[in-house]
Design a protein with these regions (language model features):
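Conserved short alpha-helical segments that host acidic/polar catalytic motifs at enzyme active sites
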Residues: 3, 8-10, 14-265
């Protein structure tokens, strides 16, 4: 599933509960900041679009939030913090509710929102004033800056970011990486200036605790992924049988998609 948040003349979210590789986007000319999210379903059925990121919220001003990771104390926090009932099942949505409960969007309110969270996370929060907040927890994130273009681009890993830039903008200037540490809250404003403050990461999962999540079904997710690949195989010159052959060779669905789209792994 994929959703886009765009800030230009106004904030809007465009979304569909479909695999990202099936989506085609037409971006407004006045879009100044774009935040996208592709989701591997863990908690909350992705076929219900309200479960998919980025989520909308309001803390005096509208914002959109996306989360990379899994939280395992969301139900406890909803009860302890008296958060309003919601049909949204996704664990990440508790961060939206906590931030909205703060009544403002600031370093202080973001810090108060993320410090009680337990699990794995890196968050991005985009507000209607063109401010992008990146909250770096214990999940990866790579941020590039292209100074002459006044452009910031980020992705969960450097490998993904480089592949995306190679396909989308192959002749760009050489970027430099903006280094972000675990525990950083980085805000990039509409002028491209960035400010960093810190939050306490002690509640995040350290890899020693044992926990499990409801709705976690890796095999169901993988089977859906394979079905999606077979459904679009013909557009790339392959057949569903070819997908099965690749799988029999031991390739994972992600590697098969790379072969289909790029001709390489």
């Amino acid at each position: 599933e994929i959703r886009l948040s765009l800030v230009g003349s106004e904030m809007c979210i465009r979304d569909s509960p479909y695999p990202a590789h099936l989506m085609r986007f037409k971006l407004p000319d006045d879009a100044a900041c774009i935040m996208g999210h592709t989701r591997m379903t863990t908690q909350g059925d992705g076929k219900h679009n309200y479960n998919n990121h980025p989520f909308e919220g309001t803390a005096v001003i509208p914002f959109a939030l996306a989360h990379n990771g899994v939280l395992y104390n969301d139900l406890t926090l909803r009860k302890d913090k008296n958060l309003p009932p919601t049909r949204i099942e996704t664990d990440s949505y508790v961060a939206v509710q906590l931030l909205a409960q703060q009544g403002e969007l600031s370093f202080r309110s973001i810090r108060s929102t993320v410090e009680p969270l337990r699990g794995t996370l890196t968050l991005s929060v985009l507000d209607s004033r063109d401010n992008l907040h990146i909250i770096k927890g214990n999940n990866p994130l790579t941020l590039y800056h292209f100074p002459r273009m006044g452009l910031f681009v980020y992705a969960s890993t450097e490998q993904i970011l480089k592949k995306g830039l190679k396909k989308g903008m192959p002749r760009m200037e050489q970027p430099f990486e903006v280094m972000i540490r675990e525990g950083d809250i980085l805000r990039i404003d509409r002028q491209g200036q960035y400010t960093v403050e810190r939050f306490d990461t002690r509640n995040l999962w350290d890899g020693t605790a044992h926990f499990s999540w409801p709705y976690w079904d890796v095999y169901a997710v993988q089977n859906e992924y394979i079905d999606d690949l077979k459904s679009v195989a013909a557009a790339y010159g392959y057949t569903p049988h070819d997908i099965d052959v690749f799988l029999s060779y031991g390739l994972c669905p992600e590697e098969i998609e790379e072969i289909m789209c790029c001709g390489e792994v």
